[in-house]
A protein has these predicted regions:
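An alpha-beta-alpha
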Residues: 58, 146-193, 295-310
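Beta-alpha junction/loop-to-helix N-cap segments that form part of ligand/metal-binding clefts
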Residues: 79-135, 230-245
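Flexible loop/turn connectors
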Residues: 257-309
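Structural motif
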Residues: 73-95, 204-218
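Extracytoplasmic "Venus flytrap"
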Residues: 37-59, 65, 75-84, 178, ...
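Short, low-complexity disordered leader/linker segments with a strong preference
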Residues: 1-38
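Flexible loop/hinge segments that line or gate small-molecule binding clefts
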Residues: 111, 118-154, 251-265
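Hydrophobic alpha-helical segments within soluble ligand-binding/sensing domains
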Residues: 129-168, 270-289
């Protein structure tokens, strides 16, 4: 009798446990329906408006591809232009378990490339990926690296300089000696400028500390100043402008933010659009695309940005044809 009662109790308990398990499984979200949160490591070389716009564009591009806040975790770091931090942060981002890593600007991409040969590396705003030894071929990168390149439209810039300031004969190119992409841009700009009958004198600075003194020397030797896509110069562009205050030489930079901050004009690649394209490429790789087979997306044509207010202050007459074709006019 006791055994029958015990068996009954055990059976009842078994039913309760089974029912509980069934209820629990019915109310638990199916694992297969749970979306994996992508992990993306991002290293930005330095803070300045152009690179900040690229980072914003990356986030927007990811969102457009379905990777919104709840579907992607961004592990963001900024080396603030410190090369030693680039190496340390690159290793940290690789070790953090990210699905891939992104380098905004050439030094950041180079740091990440040195830190891993296996994890996908996506370049953002790399002017010369081949010259920077990041990829061997733009159409078929062949390794763990691909991305988006902001090739400087040097020929268009030379044409704009001649259209706005036809009396300019000698241009000073101000750039950082530590950035490989800047050297490549200067060589290309110089070649186009010389074909157009202009003389280009180059002025390289090792860091932001030498910008003021270098600009002071430049202004006594040149008719205008040209600045490539250069993170060192961009991060201290206000120093370039203030050091040129008395000489009032027209400055032709290579980014919209710098035209707004004291440049006369430029032909630029839209940095936000570049970031969006980078974000979409990140999404492709997250979905299974191989960097080795994913061509580098090259932005090679730009739009002109004119600082009309500053041009008038410098006595520069802007042809109507230039104004009509401008992508942006700052009044």
């Amino acid at each position: 009798m006791k055994n029958k009662r015990l068996i009954g109790i055990i059976a009842a308990l078994a039913v309760l446990v089974a029912g509980s398990l069934i209820y629990s499984s019915m109310n638990k979200p199916e694992a297969k329906n749970e979306k994996k949160v992508a992990k993306v490591g991002v290293l930005q070389f330095v803070s300045h408006p152009s690179l900040d716009l690229i980072y914003k564009g990356i986030q927007d591009g990811l969102a457009e591809e379905g990777y919104k806040d709840d579907q992607v975790k961004i592990d963001f770091m900024n080396s603030e232009g410190d090369q030693s931090k680039v190496a340390t942060m690159s290793k940290q981002l690789v070790a953090n378990g990210n699905d891939l890593v992104v380098g905004i600007a050439t030094p950041a991409a180079q740091g990440l490339a040195s830190a891993t040969k296996d994890l996908p590396v996506i370049m953002a705003a790399i002017t010369d990926p081949i010259g920077a030894n990041l990829v061997k071929d733009l159409k078929k990168p062949g390794g763990n690296i691909t991305g988006v390149s902001d090739h400087n439209p040097a020929q268009q810039q030379v044409e704009l300089i001649k259209a706005l300031t036809p009396n300019v004969k000698t241009i000073g190119a101000l750039y950082s000696s530590s950035e490989d992409n800047s050297k490549t841009q200067v060589e290309e700009f110089k070649a186009y400028a010389e074909k157009a009958g202009l003389t280009v004198e180059t002025f390289a600075v090792p860091s932001t500390n030498e910008i003021a003194s270098t600009v002071n020397v430049m202004t006594s030797k040149v008719d205008a100043i040209w600045v490539p896509i250069d993170n060192t110069i961009a991060s201290a562009f206000s120093t370039v402008v203030s050091s040129n205050q008395s000489a009032k030489k027209p400055i032709y930079p290579s980014a919209t933010a710098m035209v707004e901050a004291g440049g006369v004009a430029s032909v630029v690649v839209d940095q936000h659009d570049l970031g969006v394209a980078t974000g979409k490429m990140i999404a492709q790789v997250l979905k299974g695309a191989k960097p080795a087979d994913t061509p580098v997306n090259v932005f090679s044509t730009g739009k002109s940005v004119i600082n009309k207010k500053l041009a008038q202050e410098l006595g520069i007459t802007i042809p109507e044809s230039v104004l009509k074709e401008a992508g942006q006019v700052i009044e």
